[in-house]
Every structure is written in C-alpha cells, then in structure tokens.
Amino acid sequence: MLKLICIAFLVTVLTLVAGEDSLDPAEYGCADDINQEDLLKKNDVCLQCEDLHKEGVVFSLCKTNCFTTQYFTNCVKDLEEAEKEPPE
C-alpha cells in the first residue's frame, strides 16, 4: 500500500513539474492549438502590466478573449512606454 501511495505521489509531482512551462489555452479563451510559446509570452505581458499598474484586475482584463481586447493592446503600449522612461 505504501508503494502505491509513493507512486501516486511521484506521478503527481512529475505532472506538476512537467506542466510548469505550459498554460491551459481554455483559461484564456484560446483555441487548443495555440502555440504554447506565444501563450506564455502574452501571459507574461499581462503579468508585467499588472505589476506596472499595481491592480489585480489588469491581468484578468488583459488575458480576456485570448489577448484580443484593447486591454492587451494598451498593456503592450504601456510596457513599451515604461521601457523608454529613464529610471528614477
């Protein structure tokens, strides 16, 4: 019985580790065949935008409808502008 529990635990851990670099497209309203690399990059834009604006709702709005809303576009622009600004 202990072996079975250990195997189940190991499988769970390996599944979590293997899935670290992948996201569920359905969570973002995207088609299942979306390129994972593109999904990760767009997700990162939304995370950076949320950090820039310091508001939790930004991430949710940014990723809506597979990153096709004006919120995502504005996040890209905001991040580009933030890069141009000299550090304080």
From Swiss-Prot:
- Keyword check for DNA repair: no
Drop me one GO molecular function for this one: neuropeptide hormone activity
* Compartment(s) where it occurs, according to its Swiss-Prot or TrEMBL record: Secreted
Could you tell me which cysteines form disulfide bridges?
C30-C66, C46-C62, C49-C75
> Tissue specificity, please?
Expressed by the venom gland.
Question: Where does the signal peptide begin and end?
Answer: 1-19
* SUPFAM superfamilies membership: Crustacean CHH/MIH/GIH neurohormone (SSF81778)
- May I have one GO cellular component term? extracellular region
Keywords assigned by UniProt?
Answer: Disulfide bond, Pyrrolidone carboxylic acid, Secreted, Signal
The similarity annotation says: Belongs to the arthropod CHH/MIH/GIH/VIH hormone family.
Other notes: Co-purifies with latroinsectotoxin.
The function of this protein is: May increase the toxicity of alpha-latrotoxin and/or other venom components. Is non-toxic to mice and to the cockroach Periplaneta americana.
According to UniProt, the name of this protein is Alpha-latrotoxin associated low molecular weight protein 2
